[in-house]
A protein has these predicted regions:
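Core segments of cupin and vicinal oxygen chelate
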Residues: 1-19
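Residues at secondary-structure transition points
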Residues: 5-6, 49, 65, 98
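A structure-centric signal for secondary-structure junctions around beta-strands
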Residues: 10, 36-38, 95
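Vicinal oxygen chelate
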Residues: 17-21, 26-28, 33-87
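A short, polar/charged loop-to-alpha-helix boundary motif
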Residues: 84-100
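Short, C-terminally biased terminal segments at protein or domain edges
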Residues: 97-109
Length: 109
């Protein structure tokens, strides 16, 4: 109440997502832009089951699926990757396989 937006509009919130503190904020004015892959959210997954679950829930733009990246129904880019992605990408052969995948499939690495 008393802010620049309509009553009931969320301007700032924080929440916990699977044990991780997250925060979100909105602007009081309209902006004529959308989300781009320049900003993405990384989800570090323990195993293939977790990768599959996040992917199924988030990926909504099949043509945007590249090397573990997907785009949700709102246009937000996500990186759904194994917890050891840096180690995997350090190996040239493994990196080449990942770069040719949409959703990362650990069984093919």
């Amino acid at each position: 109440e008393g802010g620049p937006l309509d009553a009931g509009t969320v301007m700032f919130t924080d929440f916990t997502l699977r044990g991780t503190w997250m925060a979100a904020t909105d602007s009081g004015t309209f902006h004529d832009f959308t989300f781009t892959p320049g900003v993405s959210i990384i989800v570090s997954c323990r195993d293939q089951e977790e990768i599959d679950r996040y992917w199924a829930g988030l990926s909504a733009v099949p043509e945007a699926e590249r090397c573990g990246w997907c785009v949700d129904r709102l246009g937000v880019s996500w990186q759904i990757v194994p917890y050891n992605i840096a180690e995997l990408m350090a190996n040239a052969a493994t990196r080449d396989k990942i770069l040719h995948m949409g959703k990362i499939d650990l069984t093919k690495l």
